[in-house]
Amino acid sequence: DLIFNAMAFNSACWNLARIIGPAAAGFIIAIFAGGNTTSSFGVGLVYVILSLLYFVSAVSVLFIVHPGRPTQTQKRSALKDMQEALRYVVSSPIVGGLILLSILPFLFGLSINTLLPAFSTDVLNGGPEDLGLLMTGMGFGAILGSLTLAKMSSVTKKGFWIIGTGALWGGLVAIFSTTSDYLISTIVIGFIGFVSAINMSMNRSVMQLQVAQSMRGRIMSVDMMSHGLMPLGILPIGHIAETTSVQTGLLTSGIALLLLTLLFGALMPQVRKINLGYK
């Protein structure tokens, strides 16, 4: 319960920042640019503030004191630790399957974040304000999804939930690509935020429950490192969007996420059998 609630709270805070951050940045730029659309001072100031916030965040972590219960007594090189983590992932069908299912959304599901400005301009004929509202809709849906996850710690068949929300995420992206009405697009993208928050947070929560305590930090590092594969999905989807249309690019990414999630879910019975997140 504590892990699920912690992941839900972390996701809710992150998505709340997605709503507040762009609005605050736009407000700062508007004030210091003084209506000059060619001014770079306001944008530069936003990056300075962002850097300071990162610094404050890093310093704050240094003051967290928690002795924990370390289980590793030998000092080894970082390379050997990483090799052991990769062997653990390969040898565990459940952990490897969860990491694979977490990679697919980063390859295809998050393409909507990259293509959203072009979709808002080319398809919805919207301006910066419309794009901001679409992003707010996604963030608001993600917050609701995070809060919903906090109530799902006792839900059974979590493996099916992870696979199902991943497939639904892809289906919603495909549906979003066919919309041309601003209100409908906002509603659909809100559902995308809702489903994506549940999928990513539940996957990571279940993964932590499946991994041995001595390996937890290294496995989470492998999981985070795998998210760096996102450009591999954005490049072909962006090429499709450029050579055909934004709608076709989004439709392709949505269908790819839907079908690949269902395919790998069908090929990984151990993941489907995950019940309460415990072995």
Regions found by a protein language model. Give the residues of each.
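Coil-to-alpha-helix initiation sites in intrinsically disordered, low-complexity, charged segments
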Residues: 7, 11, 73-81, 214
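C-terminal transmembrane bundle of multi-pass solute transporters/carriers
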Residues: 47, 51, 55, 83, ...
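Glycine/proline-centered helix-kink
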Residues: 15-30, 114, 146, 230-238
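Juxtamembrane intracellular "pre-TM" segments in multi-pass secondary transporters
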Residues: 66-100
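Cytoplasmic helix-loop-helix junction between adjacent transmembrane helices
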Residues: 1-16
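Residue-level signature of transmembrane alpha-helical cores of multipass secondary-active transporters
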Residues: 11, 18, 23-27, 101-106, ...
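Recurrent gating helices in multi-pass secondary carriers
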Residues: 94, 102, 106-114, 197, ...
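Helix-loop-helix hairpin linking two adjacent transmembrane segments in secondary transporters
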Residues: 15-60
